[in-house]
Amino acid sequence: MTVQLLHLSDLHFGGLADLDQIEALEQMLPDLRPDAVVVTGDLSQRARHGEFQRARALVQVAARTAPVLVIPGNHDVAWWTRPLIPLAKQPLYAKYRRYFGADLVPTLTLPGAIIASALTSHGVSWGSLTLQLRDLAVKGHLPKRELARVRGLFDSAPREQARVLVVHHNVLRGDISRRMGLARWRQAQRRIVASGAEVVLCGHDHEEGAELLGGRVVVSTAGTLCKRTRGGRPSTFNFVTIEPTAVHITYFRWDVESRRFRASDTYAFARVGKGAAPAPAPAPPPAQPVSADTTSHS
């Protein structure tokens, strides 16, 4: 069974979001016909009510087309309210939960896939502390307990379902930024591979990516729909197609002249058991929309 996922990230409502791009996305959503829409965090800029309200409006529009799974990013966590109280983290997510529900790690089950999320945005936490002051509350942390929970979900799912892991922080190094989104990233990568995930959806770095982790896990890193792109690149979102034998990731890039998103590069990976490998043949692009053609920013 084929599963198609529209992968968005880093919208940054609150001054950075490009409203023309948001409108174009809303118009083309029905024509893309995804089975689900996944938003991998940073819906807001400063975790303010008005920013979350605008982000929720977009999620509600997307939900008319397909189920939507949303997770918080580091910008959605009001870490400054309790920066040094590690046991008082729940208030940090209060505003986010008001608009997107109490569950910070939702799971979505489709006929052909189980999509499980893990929380990497904790504000200031022991697991994400680094020697770089600019990374205070920016770096992510992927705790062992999170991956153990996800692995339990994957282990109990029917074999024919693709295993998709959703996190905010980029799990591979950005080509332009040369930065890892996660602290203790080597440990995190090993845990991801061991979890049984076949596909990872992430964002944070404001640069699109389609790569393999550990030689077998397909990683879709979505760009951003805000005005602060990495290296001045066009804004992007990803369209992920999971087939029984392959995974395809297509970038939709913003075209300034037409003011529309257009399908551009497509990357293909062959599915081998519960893993993947680069596929030698190019993949076809996803269905083209009728109404539209087709960064520390973190």
Residue ranges and their predicted role:
Residues 1-63, 79-80, 145, 149-152, ...:
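N-terminal active-site segment of His-dependent metallophosphoesterases
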Residues 1-6, 106-117, 158-162, 213-219:
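Beta-strand-turn-beta hairpins that frame and shape the catalytic cleft
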Residues 8-9, 37-42, 67-74, 119, ...:
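Active-site neighborhood of phospho(di)ester-bond hydrolases with catalytic His/Asp-centered motifs
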Residues 14-17, 45-50, 54, 72-82, ...:
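Active-site environment of divalent metal-dependent phosphoester hydrolases
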Residues 128-136, 141, 157-199, 205:
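Active-site-proximal segments of metal-dependent phosphoesterases and phosphodiesterases across multiple
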Residues 177-245:
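Conserved beta-sheet core of the metallophosphoesterase superfamily
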Residues 242-298:
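A short C-terminal boundary segment appended to hydrolase-like catalytic domains
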